[in-house]
């Protein structure tokens, strides 16, 4: 698994809107994505979004297993708990097992900075930071995003790619495609006319395509 593949999985593992989801209340949503490597299913990435007086809380859980013949060639586990207010990240606590390499990220916004610890190392970031929050279309406006696995700030460039037909909820729907690029990332995202995130594809850099399909 090369660096570009790990970066792709890491950012997607941060990875994170309503149509077809299981809704427990008007303020809570659950988003479930089946994840494929080319045509082979490798796991799921699920999100729990809860809105309240204190802002929005997001819990993201990903489990991927890439098998080669009868062996598990790659294992990825990620869990992130984020608290948001006014479009800015207030708190984050994330743990990742990237095929045996562990990452721990903890952060809290204090005054005009986001105080972050990555594997015990302290950093100070700007106060209003966004992760790769695909569940919130406004994140597409940000030129810099936080990788919740590594704690790194990533410069990104977004291009609108026009409208396409995508299958979602048992039918074909109009979906707007965006292309998000960084040094080691090339990601396509699809949103419905209502702004619901329904799909993702990313080139892993080794001739394989990582793909999210909304369940």
Regions found by a protein language model. Give the residues of each.
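Bacterial N-terminal signal peptides that target proteins for export
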Residues: 1-11
